[in-house]
Amino acid sequence: MSNKHTQADVILIGAGIMSATLGSLLKELSPNLEIRVFEKLENPGEESSNEWNNAGTGHSALCELNYTSERTDGSIDINKAVKVNEQFQLSRQFWSYLVNRNLIRNPEDFIRALPHISLVQGEDNVTFLRKRFKALVNHPLFNGMEFSDDNEKLKEWMPLIMDKRDTNEPIAATKIDSGTDVNFGALTRLLFQEFDHKGIDVNYNHSVEDIKRNSEGLWEVKVHDMNDEKIEYHTAKFVFIGAGGGSLPLLQKTGIKESKHIGGFPVSGLFMVCNNPEVIEQHHAKVYGKAKVGAPPMSVPHLDTRFIDGKKSLLFGPFAGFSPKFLKTGSLFDLMHSVKSDNLFTMLSAGMKELPLTKYLIQQVVLSNEKRMEELREFIPNAQSKDWDIVIAGQRVQVIKDTEDGGKGTLQFGTEVVCGEDGTMAALLGASPGASTAVHVMLEVIQKCFPEHLQEWEPKIKEMIPSYGIALSENPELYKEIEVSIEKALGLKNEEPMVIPS
């Protein structure tokens, strides 16, 4: 056993997009902070942040229909859509700041302009989409959105989807050109490259085994150095757990009261990836459909143009699966070990409540490849099985907790920050919109955990993120000004041609 002991101001657990974002923000705000990162794998961004483990959508509610619900009176509630969009704007502003200061280069390596399209079929769904369009089109954050139920126009927008489609059923779409495809794996790697220049101590192949308070009130992190097979102890005033699906088990080890009565339910994902370049060139958009009645939000089908390793790709999904692992590289015992005396009834209550989700997952797990192709053909009628392969995406651990509205054992479909009451410990749990909101979420961590520095740091935060503390939806002129600077910094011009099927 090693007797290595070190002390730092901040320890970040996990080398994904969340730790990358928090580390970058903190070093800009306080360059003298001593920060250490511990990552179990050999490289940054290999789990949930990896480009093959998520859909790469810059979630801004431009096309994701689950962010706009229909009220009982038939009107459309856009509050969640506006909130998600505002949060993504913070990320884009911070990335622009980093690019403008040459802290990261070549933004096309991690972000591309890409139209976002919502597609629905059936009279009721077309009516819903038309109402959604009318509710959003005059909002400054959704400026430029178009609606069409004209087949010829839809062929211009989505030639691959409309080719050989039966047009007897009503069909409609909205399109907005200000959407993006984001390679969060590439972005994470770029941010960690910059960590080397900022003096942040990054340790790969280091697995965190335990977290507890020592007699001095600091957090002591027990780390297994898998390179030398040694145990190390590192202390810090503040610890952030950004370990994806591995965050919940580590949070439980801290023993803080905020870690109690929280459970996690792992859901795995699969995508179909096109292997035919001719087909790939016929599509240039992220096209989101509508989840089937009774299906969970995670099941929304979408056909996505992706840019991975500088190469254009085409993916369809997601299809859900089940594994008790909390990470792709996790253990089959992760789920079982996460059940504690304080969350047992929370987990059991969720099991009783979420029978439809259980049924959905069982149905998804037993799907054959040809059944998946049938779902794909609802998007691409002429899809050929030989042109598509299966890729296994990342694990997502959905948060289960007791809430006032939902009662005991309520499943949460979202991203959640858990902070200790003294502000020395924070963890990031949950799933979508996840990485898209990284800057918003990490600012929340800073506000909750470093309140004594906020007044001092606020001018720098506003330099990095001009709309910090301001609702862009209520300041359209500021939004226009910021949008112009973002497009210039990140090179967000949508000029990609499509090949029309012959």
UniProtKB/Swiss-Prot annotation:
Per its UniProt record, the required cofactor names are: FAD
The organism's lineage is: Bacteria, Bacillati, Bacillota, Bacilli, Bacillales
Which pathway does it take part in? Carbohydrate metabolism; tricarboxylic acid cycle; oxaloacetate from (S)-malate (quinone route): step 1/1
Single GO molecular function: 2-hydroxyglutarate dehydrogenase activity
UniProt-listed GO biological process terms: tricarboxylic acid cycle
**Cited NCBIfam families:** mal_quin_oxido, PRK05257.1-1, PRK05257.1-3, PRK05257.1-4, PRK05257.2-1, PRK05257.2-4, PRK05257.3-2, PRK13339.1
Enzyme Commission number(s) from the entry: 1.1.5.4
Question: Native species of this protein?
Answer: Oceanobacillus iheyensis (strain DSM 14371 / CIP 107618 / JCM 11309 / KCTC 3954 / HTE831)
Q: What protein name applies here?
A: Probable malate:quinone oxidoreductase
Recorded hits in InterPro entries, A to Z, give: FAD/NAD-bd_sf, MQO
Catalytic class of the enzyme: oxidoreductase
- Write out the similarity annotation: Belongs to the MQO family.
What does the UniProt keyword field contain? FAD, Flavoprotein, Oxidoreductase, Tricarboxylic acid cycle
